[in-house]
Amino acid sequence: MKGNIYSLFVLIAAFFWGTTGTVQALAPESATPLAFGAFRLLIGGSAMLLAVWISRELHVKNWAWPLVFLAAVCMACYQPLFFTAVKETGIAVGTVIAIGSAPIIAGTLEWAVLKKRPRNSWWIATVLALAGCWLLFSDSSNVRIDVAGVLMALGAGASFAGYTLISKAMMKTQPPRATSAVVFMISAILLTPLLWQLDISWILTPRGLGTSLYIGLIATCAAYFLFAKGLTGVPASAAVTLSLAEPLTASLLGVFFIGEMLSPSSWLGIALMMLGLLVISAAPRKQKTAEAAHMS
């Protein structure tokens, strides 16, 4: 049961992330992907840092600072790559490729670098979810494929996988919420200088401020605190596979709020993705039950 709670934390986080593409589409047209991503980190990172400071969780003694900065670089790269991909190739395709590629990259890195072979449930769930991803955007008459956008989405997927693996390693010895807060604040600092080169007047409009606050406070601060908590109870590769709930959410929001069209095969893809998420969500409980039986 406890393992399923950690999986639920990741799923809720992924749901919030899945709203980012739709929220970006609702932002003013002058809001560039780079500026939107930078404000997301700035607002979200500030809120996270304030929260851990108030709760007195901000203890940074004996931290693995090289890993902290590497995780921050991954997150700083993820923001502009993801939002540009969504703008260039659509909400559904951009999100599906970005997050759909991440489980493969994360599982491969976890196996190659950490010598930790993913569980059988991960393979089954990832195959189901990725097959669902492919079906979700395989009908070219309903979506647009932009090569540059696809490459940026793949880069975003690699950045997210790297962030997850590094965060998982750090959270073995560092407090999850404080680690996430510091990583996001450093990421914001890395991207903030770029704001001076962009037109950011849009954030002073009601739509600009509203979408920025939502993306920073809900889809970043709340979501990544939940994700950090989830990482303490599930493997990094499983967490990234669970994150496939993000494109599932994004696709449904794209249909119901933005007017994007999905074919019957795309709906079949959604069903496969949901099945994959159920498989990986149930895995921690089964593993724990097996361990308990073995100990008895």
Curated annotation (Swiss-Prot):
It holds the Pfam family EamA. The chain crosses the membrane at residues 8-28, 34-54, 63-83, 89-109, 121-141, 147-167, 183-203, 208-228, 238-258, 261-281. Residues 15-138, 158-282 form the EamA domain. The keyword Thylakoid does not apply. Its main location: membrane. Keywords: Cell membrane, Membrane, Repeat, Transmembrane, Transmembrane helix, Transport. The keyword Transport applies. It is a multi-pass membrane protein. Disulfide bonds: none annotated. It is found in: Cell membrane. GO terms for cellular component: membrane; plasma membrane. InterPro entries: AA-Vitamin_Transporters (IPR050638), CO/AA/NH_transpt (IPR004779), EamA_dom (IPR000620). Belongs to the EamA transporter family. This is Uncharacterized transporter YwfM.
